Amino acid sequence: MMMGFAVSDELLGTVAPIVVYWLYSGIYVALSSLESYRLHSKVEEEEKNLVSKSSVVKGVLVQQVVQAVVAILLFTVTGSDAEADKAQQFSFLVLARQFVTAMIVLDTWQYFMHRYMHQNKFLYKHIHSQHHRLIVPYAYGALYNHPVEGLLLDTIGGALSFLVSGMSPRTSIFFFSFATIKTVDDHCGLWLPGNLFHMVFKNNSAYHDIHHQLYGTKYNFSQPFFVMWDRILGTYMPYSLEKREDGGFEARPTKEFKDD
């Protein structure tokens, strides 16, 4: 006799984004040899980055453990949403509203926290500079942060977007998996033809690559979805995407910004 095995929405909401992170990163690792679509060459990646890939993996795993613990606590405190799911009929419009609300909340939280970590010299030196050891970003380095930064920016930001939007644990499975894919894509270091994220969002791998360069650290703080706060508050750095002579692409800021 076969025994049923039920997996709760809360468990999936905790585990799915972590699994999605490594699966989607793995796709970009497989594509990283495509020099004609890279924003930096492999040589630049090896020479400019200030941290080993093994250290990056360890750092990401630490953050994901913290992320999982906070998610479990959050679901425990808010309680099971099973009864609410039965009582409430979710329409597409309700789900769309929750997604958009969560996206705006997450973007707002991350913009101001991210910008403050650049402006506060102590926080930048001791915490945020760890992420900027990756001058040439790559996919699975997206969540390579100091544990304190991971908690403040990503984990607490995610919890706020969950609570403010009013989404259920089941909806959160899809939202946080989507947010994870978007974050990985922004750090992938590739500009691939037909990438839907590049078509829909101005905040993309080229946009975020600018921020990782020395001349861009005061600009392009927005992540992971929109660029509205950069535009509103004057931290938007315009750029053009140019073909490199040795193959691939380069995100080049306008001259007046690069000389700033």
Curated annotation (Swiss-Prot):
Pfam families given in the database record: FA_hydroxylase
Note on domains (UniProt): The histidine box domains may contain the active site and/or be involved in metal ion binding.
UniProt-recorded Gene Ontology molecular function terms: iron ion binding; sphingolipid C4-monooxygenase activity
UniProt KW keywords: Endoplasmic reticulum, Lipid biosynthesis, Lipid metabolism, Membrane, Oxidoreductase, Transmembrane, Transmembrane helix
Record InterPro entries: Fatty_acid_hydroxylase, Sterol_Desaturase_Related
EC number: 1.14.18.5
Domain Fatty acid hydroxylase: 99-235
Motif Histidine box-2 per record, residues: 128-132
Protein name: Sphinganine C4-monooxygenase 1
Membrane topology type: Multi-pass membrane protein
Catalytic activity annotation: a dihydroceramide + 2 Fe(II)-[cytochrome b5] + O2 + 2 H(+) = a phytoceramide + 2 Fe(III)-[cytochrome b5] + H2O
